[in-house]
Amino acid sequence: MQAQGSQSNVGSLRSNCSDNSLPNNHVMMHCDESSGSPHSEHNDYSYEKTNLESTASNSREHRDNQLSRLKSEEYVVPKNQRRGLLPQLAIIPEFKDARDYPPMMKKMIVFLIAFSSMMGPMGTSIIFPAINSITTEFKTSVIMVNVSIGVYLLSLGVFPLWWSSLSELEGRRTTYITSFALLFAFNIGSALAPDINSFIALRMLCGAASASVQSVGAGTVADLYISEDRGKNLSYYYLGPLLAPLLSPIFGSLLVNRWPWRSTQWFMVILSGCNVILLTVLLPETLRKQDSKGAIAQILAERRIQVDNNERGEIQEDYQRGEDETDRIENQVATLSTEKHNYVGEVRDQDSLDLESHSSPNTYDGRAGETQLQRIYTEASRSLYEYQLDDSGIDATTAQVTRIRSTDPKLARSIRENSLRKLQTNLEEQVKKVLSSNGGEIAPKQVSAVRKVWDTFFVYFIKPLKSLHFLEYPPVALAITFSAISFSTVYFVNMTVEYKYSRPPYNFKPLYIGLLYIPNSVTYFFASIYGGRWVDMLLKRYKEKYGILAPEARISWNVVTSVISFPIALLIFGWCLDKKCHWVTPLIGTALFGYAAMMTIGATLSYLVDSLPGKGATGVALNNLIRQILAATAVFVTTPMLNGMGTGWAFTMLAFIVLGASSVLIILKKHGDYWRENYDLQKLYDKID
């Protein structure tokens, strides 16, 4: 009886332990030790071992599939078609779409760009511990040495406008290699400068050369990652320009403690030289052909299409009732377009994914009339498309039509017919104007050399200034305002640390002053890594809840914590120095400051890139322009402000400025979606292009 009972228990145990949900080759007994099975522990181990082996096998297979892309013609651009300067020297192939790179390769490119982005800010701060030595050797004043720092910062802010434009015309790789090769040469000049005037001039050129990555770097990250993964990787990239001002005084103090001040410049020569080699060998071209003007226009059009779905459906029904009459007008417009194509040949599709859709000097070969006609007919096509989908289609080439809505079919049909007639009339007038201005010839056979030189000069030097029009877009202007104010406080803090700790009652040597930047460097690093993940999580959560990606989702509790911490950190730092507290206590303020600054700057940078589809590098260039102007101002006014107001009250004023500026984040959070849906961003893009 006992044996039978035992067999019955075992049978029951087997029945309870079988897992029919597993595949046949993975079915195992998996029971608790209390069940009394002598093989349960062994089976648990076998099950876990099988799972681990399966996971490892899948991981290896996934990695092999990722690496196989490097040799696949489906992903890789042929060697003879690769873009950029010296593409044959790059060991990493160019992909047809930069977002198809394996994850580890994307990370490597991001960290390479982050390393490059350290060059500019490091060149500024590395001479902080050497200011007194430079003053002594050149027999000049501290103010003149500060001028060399200020002009460096100004050029670091102004020149990204041109570098970002060059990167969109010639590609990222060409821009990086050219700029850092120039930086290498100018750093040699700075190390050999015979007097303060030449030193100031060469420092300005160094700032201009190192400025490329300050704007193009964010564009490179946008090339590689979709919006949901962009915040985290932008934070990795932004470690470079934000950690450099904090780490470079440490390097500078170590160098000045052992060698003369010129060693700081020779250190920059070595660093920039290594960077040129790394960029040449490891950086492929990442500028996406998929981000052409046509693709960007499609994205913006889709945004506007989503705004008024219900009304659009009603209007489409009304338009259908009046189809016979309106088709006649549309056919007349289409006939004009056909005649134009017969006259000048086939016009490239504006939605082409070819990189040549970007403007370049080659497009200015005397075919100005043809280009103008292409623009007119492209705008006309877009207007017709908008009229078919939405009654609010307002075109750049036509007189603005009052936005009238009606549920009366006859009135709606009349409004649409009138709008289309205006479009037809304006189109005919503009075509006649272009043809008459060119004497009936669209493509003159010969173009003067002077005109070609002027066109090239315009594209590379004048046209980048048009990017200032982006400041007309409220989300861009507001985000840049807060980002610039936050960034300028970094230089107020850095200059104050060097100024106050080198004087009584502290009297620190340059080596120890450099080490004082460690607390905020640590919190910078922490906030950069986890802050980027935080903003990506917020964006994904918003998409899961509402089904769309909204840049405003990046501004949430992450920014609230930093806005609260920011003024507190400045007050602790300023008043502890003012009251001559123990040297450690002001560093509590700098540590908290590092977290607050990085969290806000990182979130606003991600927001800025997401707000300008396909123009992230240009947006970041504008951001750099404004923030570096304020940073240069901080360099010039910090010492007089500390002497005139006292450290405590000076940083109290800064705390209130930051607190007041944070109100723009509330405005962005509340009204960002309204501007995104109602502002015609495509018109702004057309104005810049």
Swiss-Prot record:
Principal localisation: membrane
Domain of life: Eukaryota
Localization (cell): Cell membrane
TM region positions: 109-131, 140-163, 176-193, 236-256, 266-283, 476-493, 511-532, 559-577, 587-609, 625-642, 649-668
CDD domains xref list: MFS_Tpo1_MDR_like
Topology Cytoplasmic: residue spans: 132-139, 194-235, 284-475, 533-558, 610-624, 669-689
Family the entry assigns: Belongs to the major facilitator superfamily. CAR1 family.
Function noted in UniProt: Multidrug resistance transporter involved in resistance and adaptation to quinidine and to the herbicide barban (4-chloro-2-butynyl [3-chlorophenyl] carbamate).
Miscellaneous field: Present with 279 molecules/cell in log phase SD medium.
PANTHER family from the UniProt entry: MAJOR FACILITATOR SUPERFAMILY (PTHR23502), QUINIDINE RESISTANCE PROTEIN 3 (PTHR23502:SF5)
Entry protein name: Quinidine resistance protein 3
Lineage of source species: Eukaryota, Fungi, Dikarya, Ascomycota, Saccharomycotina
